[in-house]
Amino acid sequence: ATAVEKLPCPDCNSRQSLQVFLNRDEALGLDFYSSFCFSECWEAKGDPYNGGPAPEVYVKTKEDIANELKTAKSCPIFNLRSNYRGIPIEYFKSWGCRQFLSEFDGTTPYAIGFPLSLEGELVGWKARPLRKKDFFGIGKTSGVDPFGLERAWPLATDTLWITEGEFDAIALDYCMTLAGKSKMYPVISLSHGGGSINKNLSLIRDRLIKRKIKNLVLVLDDDEVGKLAEKAALRLWDNVYIVSKPGLAKDANDAVLFGYEIEMGKLALGFKND
């Protein structure tokens, strides 16, 4: 099968998580399309074109991408007037998040942008509109390092905490600062949910070893995708610890929204006792 393009998933609404493939049936001499959602659904979705031809896709040039990155970097640091998703705004600032503005009036906050890097270089942004559950990419968004990796390196000694989403990473950092003694912690988020853990850990494995990272602490979603990701990590790394969530929270951001910030922080910091 040949990868064709990435589309929004119609079921979980994740942007660019539906990978389309072109397949060849040699016995019948026919080509056909199939797809798979690598985000929350984590399942095959069939032909996204319903038997029709694939639309022509414009391939962005390096100049196009460079201009997009320049525009994104010119946007202000994320700075809403109140907490967002229960997290104090200053935490978003410390993670380098940008505030993308409405293209209609140029002043109304429209989306939050999460910086994406590869080997230390800023290569793209993952953006989420403030008023709906959706994502869109700016610049390079595939084949990138986990969100927060460059931030984590100078903070890490022998332990790295891993979440399944950008909001969860920032929320977990917030929780641990309340429960612990440090002002910042080495937390990263998988680039495309739990289904990307194999790809992410394989991409950064040599750097983890070089920097003498010993423990990987997983604070993933309490769902099927999260459980599969935990099993995958246990096959890829020797010292993997799985942290439970307090109360009815299914992830770190839930813990914040439910008022379990300190409890979540204590569980994450006490990973060897969980």
Language-model segments: residues:
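Short, surface-exposed amphipathic charged segments that create phosphate/polyanion-binding patches used
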Residues: 110-111, 201-207, 250-266
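Residues at the starts of beta-strands that form the adenosine-phosphate
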Residues: 186, 215, 239
